[in-house]
Design a protein with these regions (language model features):
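Sec-dependent N-terminal signal peptides
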Residues: 4-12
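Small-residue packing motifs within transmembrane alpha-helices
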Residues: 2-5, 45
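Surface-exposed ligand/attachment interfaces on beta-rich extracellular proteins
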Residues: 34-39
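Globin-like tetrapyrrole-binding proteins
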Residues: 50
């Protein structure tokens, strides 16, 4: 009987444990190294374009509430501040060939958590 209860408990735990959805992100057009080679104007244009792209994610089915942190955080910053955040983050990255779209998301997410 003890074994049966243990087995039932194990099955319940396994089935109740939330599964995480795997998401594949395409590499995009630029690497972290490409960003460092951009002019200041290009860096500001890139980061604001990246944010604009993330803000239209609901068009592709992303829940709008998932963007609240980005709207709140980026709405308080200038394009210069956003580019500065990304520049610092990219310089600290060990992999210059990292996909810039993912690096940008991570940089913004980290910066916004500290505000």
């Amino acid at each position: 009987m003890k074994y049966l209860l243990a087995l039932v408990a194990l099955i319940v735990v396994i089935n109740v444990h939330p599964t995480q959805q795997t998401v594949k992100i395409s590499p995009g057009f630029f690497t972290a190294k490409d960003y460092l080679d951009m002019t200041d104007t290009e860096k500001r244009a890139y980061v604001t374009g990246q944010i604009n792209g993330m803000l239209v994610a609901p068009f592709f089915g992303a829940p709008e509430e998932n963007l609240a942190w980005l709207k709140t955080c980026s709405g308080k910053m200038s394009d210069e501040q956003l580019a500065s955040i990304l520049s610092r983050y990219v310089r600290d990255q060990p992999n210059p060939q990292a996909n810039l779209n993912v690096v940008t998301f991570n940089a913004l997410r980290e910066a916004c958590r500290h505000q």
